[in-house]
Design a protein with these regions (language model features):
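Carbohydrate-binding surface patches
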Residues: 438-474, 481-483, 505, 509
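Glycoside hydrolase catalytic-domain groove-lining segments
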Residues: 296-351
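N-terminal secretory signal peptides that target proteins for export/translocation
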Residues: 1-19
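Substrate-binding cleft and catalytic face of glycoside hydrolase catalytic domains
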Residues: 87-310
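Mature N-terminal, pre-catalytic/accessory segment of carbohydrate-active enzymes
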Residues: 39-83, 87-90
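Conserved, mostly hydrophobic/aromatic
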Residues: 62, 130, 191, 219, ...
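Aromatic/acidic polysaccharide-binding cleft in carbohydrate-active enzymes
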Residues: 339-424, 428-444
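C-terminal beta-strand-rich structural cap/linker in extracellular carbohydrate-active enzymes
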Residues: 491-512
Length: 512
């Protein structure tokens, strides 16, 4: 969950438009007979393997948000980065964010002629652990929290001495103290130089050596900018250009991503302005845009409601995606899209109630939602489909976590992502796929022709088991994530009698 969670926490009703609530899932697939399940007839899956509808551009991925449990030496940190490394995803997003200034901001005090406050001692361990865990894969870096001294404020903004203590009002100020943006661009130039150029020279001419020579393939410029520092499209575009200029001086090969909007459907003006090349300085690239979606139920709803609310809200978001993509194609057709925060936020998050975990099936339901979004966004040829987020825990959006903080294991949301990531890739052909029968809307299905064979992705959106009759089932095998797999990887499913049984909220990949 990126940085705007804070803002949503402070004004939840407004942000529901941009990040919606939480999913609850329970599901598993297993061998089924041809007998119909009680209350629902089996669905019939028909696939035309020779009829390609679209070629996928979509990479399944996720984000890592800096939180204290990810600090080096914490048990959850070691387990989490082990999971990241074993997953091996491309374009994982890394976001040190605003509640923890000491873990996110490298120069917390304004420089003077006598001294500067550059300090990476708390930032480096988590960042290096992330870069080591993603070695060999492109990443999306985003140090989105700027030093507040860059902005005009009535008085200096304070922050806790304890780096683990959250503060929700750090991002104060709307007007830069240097209206040209050069001071801000210089901060990011030095920050990036620390990691890619072995160090930097500070404002007083003092050299700071790191010895690091990492590559930053993609840099996302700030986060949820309509909230943090209350930027207008004009403000943000000017600041984007200044930051890109600064980072390009340190890392000429880096590509850039913009906006990371929390509430995209509320802000078409950002897309119209930012994607227009005439509004940028000459030579400033807009390689990617990004924006977010969270499903969010009301407090009175239960899991029996969530199974409808989440997918209904997802469909609303998909309409927003289509609208935004038309703007992109019109103004900047070479720009790619990263939907880098996709998930659910339950209304109990960050309250006393979030210490009571949701039903176990919730995480399967949330996994089913991600699978549904991956299918739909692949059809729309969205480039990056990013699940949010690796680590959450009570007081810090536990409903969005992909790790079980009680046992340090990946939860079903992680295993659904791994199943999809291992099965589907950009370049796969999506072919005509049809589910027939009463209740066909309860399951989403999409067949792909991949370099490793023919596959279909199935997502049960409902809290009851559903049978699906498969073509050529005798030649097929299946993997599934469901309630029976718990915090363990997808399991093999033996198919008999031509059917697969999708247990509540199951996500399955059938291969031929």
């Amino acid at each position: 969950m990126g940085i705007g969670f804070v803002t949503k926490h402070l004004s939840q009703n407004h942000w529901i438009a941009g990040r919606f609530g939480r999913l609850f899932v329970a599901g598993f697939a297993c061998v089924a007979t041809s007998a119909a399940l009680q209350g629902q007839q089996p669905l019939q899956l028909t696939i035309h393997w020779d009829k390609t509808s679209v070629v996928s551009k979509s990479t399944p991925t996720f984000q890592v948000v800096v939180n204290p449990p990810l600090r080096r030496g914490e048990p959850l940190s070691a387990a989490s980065y082990k999971a990241v490394k074993e997953l091996g995803a491309d374009y994982v997003r890394y976001v040190p964010w605003l509640p923890y200034p000491k873990l996110a901001v490298a120069e917390l005090e304004p420089p003077t002629q006598q001294k500067t406050s550059w300090d990476f001692s708390l930032i480096d361990p988590m960042t290096i652990d992330f870069l080591n865990a993603t070695e060999g894969h492109p990443t999306v870096m985003n140090f989105s929290t700027m030093p507040t001294w860059l902005f005009k404020t009535d008085k200096p903004v304070t922050y806790p001495a304890d780096p683990n203590q959250p503060v929700w009002n750090y991002t104060q100020g709307t007007e830069l103290r240097d209206p040209t943006g050069k001071e801000m661009g210089d901060y990011y130039e030095r920050l990036v130089s620390w990691y890619v150029d072995g160090g930097f020279t500070d404002e007083n001419g003092v050299r700071h050596e790191s010895g690091y020579h990492y590559k930053f393939p993609v840099w996302e410029v700030l986060n949820e900018v309509e909230a943090e520092h209350s930027m207008t499209p004009e403000d943000y575009t000017k600041r984007y250009d200044a930051i890109v200029e600064g980072i390009h001086r340190a890392s000429p090969d880096t590509k850039f991503m913009g906006m990371a909007l929390a509430a995209p459907r509320d802000h078409p003006e950002f897309f119209e302005y930012f994607l227009n090349p005439a509004n940028h300085k000459p030579g400033i690239p807009v390689d990617y845009i990004s924006y977010h979606f969270y499903a969010s139920p009301t407090r009175s709803q239960t899991i029996s409601d969530w199974q409808y609310t989440f997918f209904d809200q997802a469909d609303g978001f998909l309409s927003t995606v289509r609208y935004i993509d038309n703007i992109r194609k019109r103004l900047s057709p070479k720009t790619k899209t990263d939907l880098d925060e996709l998930g659910v936020i339950l209304p109990t998050d960050n309250t006393a109630a979030d210490k009571v975990p949701p039903p176990a099936a919730y995480y399967n339901l949330a996994g089913s939602l991600y699978a549904y979004l991956y299918i739909q966004l692949s059809r729309l040829q969205i480039d990056l489909v990013g699940e949010s987020q690796l680590v959450g825990y009570p007081t810090q959006y536990p409903s969005v976590s992909m790790m079980n903080w009680t046992n340090n294991k990946p939860n079903p949301r992680f295993w659904v992502l791994k199943l999809i990531k291992n099965s589907f890739h950009p370049g796969d052909s999506l072919v005509d796929t049809n589910l027939g029968g009463s209740g066909s809307g309860d399951v989403e299905a999409q067949a792909f022709v991949t370099p490793t064979g023919r596959k279909v992705l199935l997502a049960n959106k409902r809290d009851h088991a559903i049978e699906v009759k498969l073509p050529d089932a005798q030649k097929a095998s299946a993997l599934t994530v469901d309630e029976s797999t718990g915090d363990e990887p997808a399991r093999n499913v033996k198919l008999t009698d031509g059917y697969i049984r999708l247990e509540p909220f199951a996500v399955s990949v059938v291969s031929w």
